Amino acid sequence: MSRTNFDTLLEAGCHFGHLKRKWNPAMAPYIFMERNGIHIIDLHKTVAKVDEAAEALKQIAKSGKKVLFVATKKQAKQVVAEKAQSVNMPYVIERWPGGMLTNFPTIRKAVKKMATIDKLTNDGTYSNLSKREVLQISRQRAKLDKTLGSIADLTRLPSALFVIDVMKENIAVREANRLGIPVFGIVDTNSDPTNVDFVIPANDDATKSVEVILDACCAAMIEGLEERKAEKIDMEAAGEAPANKGKKKSVKARLDKSDEEAINAAKAAAFIKEDEEA
């Protein structure tokens, strides 16, 4: 049974493409007709493509891997954030940080900096700083959170990208292509589908259109997550839970309180210096 249907997509306006003069010829297989100078997308093909993408996303979620959602256009930002959070997946809805994938270690370093600042806030280090210094560090934390807060849990490269408007997010698509990361995308008639592994031909400018497609895909991912959870419970019940191999022993640093405070103060000073140089 299909995860969506023709009528649902039609009601959401998924069939509306762009003006004929703006079309990309590579989208010809997904165009049903032209009406009043506007291309109309073949929703029967959209239904099939949504099913195909949803099944693949379900398997990714079931395997415990991450899908990074990307949508920086105004119409899609809020709905993408909500849907990504519903399946506990990372997302980017502000400016795409160049090198997000191809220079991932640097991005992770910035995310770790956020965690360090949070630690300084909680352990009392801030009480030894002036109001100006606290403000500088807080400003730096807010700046990092705006662009990277939604990917704080992404400890390794994602297993797939889900992009809304592949033309607007072309840098993200190119980075994923370079690293061999599969790309799922809602592709309108003005975009090039050749760099997208799972093409979902649909209107990428209407919030409702984006929402109904994400509803179907995220429902499949939730199924995958639930199946993964059920399998884990069954394995534990059968006494077949895999042993945690190669588990590293935690090594506690034997520092007295004064040494720890000195290290934290040095970290805070480094953050203040970075803010002044920025």
Swiss-Prot record:
<feature type="region of interest" description="Disordered">
    <location>
        <begin position="233"/>
        <end position="257"/>
    </location>
</feature>
<dbReference type="InterPro" id="IPR023591">
    <property type="entry name" value="Ribosomal_uS2_flav_dom_sf"/>
</dbReference>
<protein>
    <recommendedName>
        <fullName>Small ribosomal subunit protein uS2</fullName>
    </recommendedName>
</protein>
<dbReference type="GO" id="GO:0006412">
    <property type="term" value="P:translation"/>
</dbReference>
<dbReference type="InterPro" id="IPR018130">
    <property type="entry name" value="Ribosomal_uS2_CS"/>
</dbReference>
<keyword id="KW-0689">Ribosomal protein</keyword>
<dbReference type="InterPro" id="IPR001865">
    <property type="entry name" value="Ribosomal_uS2"/>
</dbReference>
<dbReference type="InterPro" id="IPR005706">
    <property type="entry name" value="Ribosomal_uS2_bac/mit/plastid"/>
</dbReference>
<comment type="similarity">
    <text>Belongs to the universal ribosomal protein uS2 family.</text>
</comment>
<keyword id="KW-0687">Ribonucleoprotein</keyword>
<dbReference type="GO" id="GO:0022627">
    <property type="term" value="C:cytosolic small ribosomal subunit"/>
</dbReference>
<dbReference type="Pfam" id="PF00318">
    <property type="entry name" value="Ribosomal_S2"/>
</dbReference>
<dbReference type="GO" id="GO:0003735">
    <property type="term" value="F:structural constituent of ribosome"/>
</dbReference>
